[in-house]
Amino acid sequence: MIISAASDYRAAAEARLPPFLFHYMDGGAYAEHTLRRNVSDLADIALRQRVLRNMSDLSLSTELFGETLAMPVALAPVGLTGMYARRGEVQAARAAAARGIPFTLSTVSVCPIEEVAPAIDRPMWFQLYVLKDRGFMRNALERAKAAGVTTLVFTVDMPTPGARYRDAHSGMSGPNAPLRRMLQAMTHPRWAWDVGLLGKPHDLGNISTYRGSPTGLQDYIGWLAANFDPSISWKDLEWIREFWTGPMVIKGILDPEDARDAVRFGADGIVVSNHGGRQLDGVLSSARALPAIADAVKGELKILADSGIRSGLDVVRMLALGADAVLLGRAFVYALAAGGQAGVENLLTLIEREMRVAMILTGTHSVAEISGDALSRVTREAAVVP
């Protein structure tokens, strides 16, 4: 298969993975309207082409939370990444480090913090949910500190799990799910050998370390459902701000008022995100939500965005809408499933090249120059940019 874009990696991942894993990563909540709009709304954004601008001094590098990034991209926290490739979190982290960008480890990763951090030569980020088990949260924060994690990403848009109908059809959940998953693995022998057998253990490493016993895929949904806390508020995060002295980013912001609350709380950054369309179907795409949020808080904290980003062109679009950087989620998991560390490195190379082309043809010499001026007048006046 010729690989020239993230869509090619998606097709390769679907061919390699058992359906329950592919659709768990690929799917969204309910009828998946928001999932689709995340992509289509970005595609609808027209850029303003400029020519004869002498683009010989182009630079993609940027500063974020005291770190120098080769481009304004970080790998997003994605649960169960270690089920998509053998010790997948380690492979993805190495790919990110090789391309000079941060990797964010999920709370519900297969590989624990202590396995991933020593595998790379740059600090990583760590994502944490707000859970009922505050002892787990404190333990995770202590371990993150000990491992040299620099930036903490708090996901706040999961006080309850989303309803993902596709999971019931694919075998991730629903009747006879364990049997269906086993049968699917048998019909995908390459994955079964490389990941299913050689990729063990398949525990949720960060949780198993805390509980002192394996917490595998069978326990995943139940443990999370029991620990998500619908009572959380900004006040509940105050002890975390006192405990964690490094940069802290609040992930899951879609409303300008919530963004202002994040500023008042003292967050160093936010992620404009609808969880990749996996939580509440029918909410705004990140691309539609971003401009109003940028108008409200730009300059008071760093603004990151995710959901729907599939190319370097999409990265430029998000920056033009007001983001300082983006998180890349599904796209890197497609590449990881299809080609491991090399696949992720190649995807990041493609994104960098696409960014360069877009910046040259919009006349923007640096990441700092990318602004609303890079958008066409038609786009600025259209409903896609509120």
UniProtKB/Swiss-Prot annotation:
SUPFAM superfamilies: FMN-linked oxidoreductases (SSF51395)
Annotated binding of substrate, by residue: 24, 129, 164, 278
Catalytic residues as annotated in Swiss-Prot or TrEMBL: 275 (proton acceptor)
Mode of membrane association: Peripheral membrane protein
Pfam families documented for this protein: FMN_dh
FMN hydroxy acid dehydrogenase domain mapped to chain residues: 1-380
Residues where FMN binds: 106, 127, 155, 251, 306-330
Domain of life: Bacteria
Protein name: L-lactate dehydrogenase
Taxonomic lineage of the native organism: Bacteria, Pseudomonadati, Pseudomonadota, Gammaproteobacteria, Lysobacterales
